[in-house]
């Protein structure tokens, strides 16, 4: 069958090929610029910056942080059979002393408060009895995480300005702990808990992810391309094009101010995979011989024939990722725009640089070098009648699995809950890493979910006695719930001070006692800088209440926050002094809840926009809405069926897997576009069987090879240390394989059904 072409496009591509040396030179210069830009991209994998800065909660949290600045909080768990034994306390005292000498580190434990109450005393058997009584005479130490059944806690505050400074500080802390961490001392284990260690691990692994997986994918790619085309020259043209495209695409981040995040590894990988698929389509068509008079004309005609489907398919993928710009999750938004921009660069390179390299390297045609897949024509001959015979089972099975996948994602009322959502920082850390295990150990007993309640009052009234009394009632109400571990605020300072001086941590409830307590708090704030952390000392216009608990015990996402807000409203209604105050939930914990609640809207909104734009764009190209819907079956089948796999495999929606809809739709639509484009070519014969045979012969082989490349590329992520990236690799690879199966079963079956329906309508009309 002759290749249909546009004479003007043939003339254009002829000039492109003739300018091959100039084109290669220009892209070489852009390659150097891209490499420079890629090296300038900053790292920003922190979870607390996932929400865009313009978000109201993010703005409020930023204002709160400016008013109540504090360093990074961390905790050392010194585990021992008896944490209050003489040896344990002596070792803890030594550790606290050495940590206090490290720059930017403030350390305190229950011994800090004991020395404040009793002065500096040598720890001996008699003194240990008094320390034990002091430590166990209140619940304050256990609530603060400074004492557990089998551990002694040392709280740390790191006042560091940069990640590099933080890493140096953590290294200094580790050098202090190393001699005691081998089990030779009184402690059976020393656990490190807190965001400094988690953030350091994430930054290290995020930065290494791209460098680790891109070479691995490159090995897969080179092996597959060589096996498919069996030509070093074809391999060279494809590899050089990919290297230039990826370098320029990554370098765009420096131009637009984007940064490396926990999911930015997907940008070069997605650009490389999509570009590779397009290059496979282009080279497969180039290798097919025709009746052209010379190689230059043949090359230009092949490019012209594939220009429309390749442009449409790359547009589909770019739109899919560009639709992520609607997300309120900043890394997702940036990743979508970054990938879409990279795909535009890739499209230009596919129709300029790649043809230039094909010409310069004189890549062989199929008559000169046999490619893999000699068995494929026989498969096509068997598939065409099989898809006609089993058209209804193929399409019906696909629709049934799609319904099951939708149920797995959105849930079934009364029977099945929706697919779970996760943004807890621990879900981004390898569970086998020591830092994750240490943090989970503390989380199970003390909880790590923190909500900051910013209570705003009339300026100058933050220390009014009645207001403080109302805040203490609110604190007691929260602490009466066993799911709440600790509540710290201005009145907790009074409780600590009262316990140190009198041995009782209970504050009086009588109104006439609070004027003196308010005066005492003012005096404490004058002498103790730590006490100022809970009051706006500049304007006395607000106070801060920090609430820590286990959010998982409250149920669905955001339930702990709603409980705190409802408790505040109840106490506020009962306390006249609180009625003029306004409370706002802020902080990293609240931002985490916001992110979680926006994951599903990000998935549905971006997917809906992607699907709508793709449908409208290709309706303009192919002019057949019913056929266009039919050709989307494999993509929709792959996306929804993969949610069923996620449900069965226990994989939750997170910052990476939430992208599966747009990623798979944009990537797999490439196959359906090429298939349907060549199906229309074959329809000129008037036979559905011949049209399907032509589409499978021309597009089927590159669809198969492109899917193998796509799935192997994303499967490389399965070796990642970052759980979300590993899960995304497994899920996306599964989706590509599912789409491939549907391409050769459900899609032809749907086209058979559509063609028979059209013939029936024409028969009735005649």
Regions found by a protein language model. Name each.
Residues 1-45, 49, 62-63, 161-424, ...:
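Membrane-embedded transmembrane helical bundles of large multi-pass transporters/channels
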Residues 44-104, 108, 460-468:
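Juxtamembrane extramembrane loops of integral membrane proteins
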Residues 50, 83-90, 161-171, 213, ...:
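Solvent-exposed, non-transmembrane alpha-helical starts
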Residues 56, 73, 386, 390-517:
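Juxtamembrane segments of multi-pass membrane proteins
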Residues 59, 95-158, 200-204, 485-551, ...:
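Extracytoplasmic
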Residues 73, 103-119, 142, 184-194, ...:
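Short beta-strand elements
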Residues 74-79, 140-181, 188-191, 451-458, ...:
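A short beta-strand structural signal in non-transmembrane regions
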């Amino acid at each position: 069958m002759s290749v249909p072409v546009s004479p003007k496009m043939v003339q254009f591509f002829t000039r492109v090929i003739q300018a091959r040396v100039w084109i290669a030179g220009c892209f070489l210069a852009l390659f150097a610029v891209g490499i420079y830009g890629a090296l300038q991209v900053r790292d920003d994998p922190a979870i607390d910056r996932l929400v865009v800065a313009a978000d109201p909660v993010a703005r409020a949290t930023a204002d709160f942080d400016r008013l109540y600045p504090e360093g990074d909080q961390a905790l050392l768990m010194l585990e021992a059979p008896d944490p209050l034994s003489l040896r344990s306390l002596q070792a803890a005292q030594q550790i606290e002393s050495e940590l206090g000498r490290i720059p930017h580190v403030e350390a305190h434990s229950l011994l800090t408060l004991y020395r404040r109450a009793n002065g500096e005393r040598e720890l001996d058997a008699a003194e240990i009895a008094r320390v034990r009584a002091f430590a166990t005479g209140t619940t304050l130490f256990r609530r603060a995480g400074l004492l557990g059944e089998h551990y002694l806690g040392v709280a740390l505050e790191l006042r560091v300005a940069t990640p590099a400074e933080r890493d140096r500080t953590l290294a200094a802390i580790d050098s202090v702990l190393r001699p005691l961490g081998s089990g030779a001392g009184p402690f059976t284990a020393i656990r490190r808990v807190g965001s400094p260690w988690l953030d350091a691990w994430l930054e290290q692994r995020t930065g290494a992810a791209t460098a680790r997986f891109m070479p691995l994918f490159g090995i897969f790619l080179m092996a597959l391309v060589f096996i498919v085309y069996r030509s070093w020259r074809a391999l060279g043209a494809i590899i050089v094009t990919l290297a230039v495209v990826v370098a320029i695409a990554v370098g765009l981040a420096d131009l637009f101010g984007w940064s490396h995040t926990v999911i930015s590894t997907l940008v070069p990988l997605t650009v490389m995979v999509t570009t590779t698929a397009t290059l496979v389509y282009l080279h497969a068509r180039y290798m097919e011989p025709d009746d052209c008079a010379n190689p230059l004309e043949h090359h230009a005609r092949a490019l012209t024939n594939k220009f429309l489907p390749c442009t449409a398919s790359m547009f589909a993928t770019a739109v899919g990722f560009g639709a992520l710009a609607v997300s309120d999750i900043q890394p997702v938004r940036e990743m979508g725009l970054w990938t879409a921009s990279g795909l535009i660069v890739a499209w230009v390179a596919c129709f300029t640089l790649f043809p230039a390299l094909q010409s310069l390297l004189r890549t062989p045609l199929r008559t000169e070098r046999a490619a893999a897949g000699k068995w494929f024509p026989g498969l096509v001959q068997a598939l065409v009648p099989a898809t006609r015979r089993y058209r209804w089972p193929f399409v019906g099975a696909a629709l049934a699995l799609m319904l099951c996948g939708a149920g797995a994602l959105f849930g079934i009322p009364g029977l099945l809950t929706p697919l779970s959502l996760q943004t807890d920082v621990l879900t981004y850390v390898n569970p086998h890493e020591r830092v994750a295990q240490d943090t989970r150990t503390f989380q199970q007993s003390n909880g790590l979910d923190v909500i900051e309640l910013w209570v705003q009052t009339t300026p100058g009234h933050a220390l009014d006695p009645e207001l403080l009394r109302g805040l203490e009632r609110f604190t007691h109400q929260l602490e009466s719930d066993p799911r709440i571990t600790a509540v710290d605020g201005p009145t907790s300072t009074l409780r600590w001070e009262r316990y140190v001086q009198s041995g009782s941590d209970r504050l009086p409830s009588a109104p006439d006692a609070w004027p003196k307590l308010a005066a005492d708090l003012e005096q404490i704030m004058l002498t103790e800088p730590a006490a100022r952390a809970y009051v706006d000392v500049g304007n006395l216009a607000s106070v801060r209440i920090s609430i820590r608990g286990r959010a998982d015990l409250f149920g669905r996402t955001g339930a702990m926050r709603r409980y705190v807000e409802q408790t505040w409203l109840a106490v506020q209604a009962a306390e006249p002094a609180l009625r003029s105050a306004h409370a706002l939930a802020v902080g990293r914990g609240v931002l985490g809840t916001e992110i979680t609640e926006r994951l599903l809207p990000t998935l549905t909104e971006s997917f809906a926009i992607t699907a709508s734009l793709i449908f409208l764009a290709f309706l303009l190209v192919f002019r057949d809405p019913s056929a266009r819907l039919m050709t989307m079956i494999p993509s929709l089948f792959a996306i929804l069926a993969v949610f069923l796999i996620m449900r069965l495999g226990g994989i939750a929606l997170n910052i990476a897997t939430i992208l599966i809809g747009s990623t798979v739709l944009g990537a797999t639509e490439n196959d359906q576009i090429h298939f349907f484009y060549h199906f229309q070519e074959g329809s000129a014969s008037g036979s559905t069987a011949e049209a399907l045979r032509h589409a499978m012969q021309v597009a089927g082989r590159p669809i198969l090879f492109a899917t193998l490349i796509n799935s192997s590329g994303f499967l490389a992520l399965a070796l990642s240390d970052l759980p979300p990236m590993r899960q995304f690799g497994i899920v996306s690879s599964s989706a590509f394989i599912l789409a491939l199966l549907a391409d050769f079963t459900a899609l032809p079956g749907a086209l058979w059904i559509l063609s028979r329906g059209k013939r029936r309508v024409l028969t009735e009309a005649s």
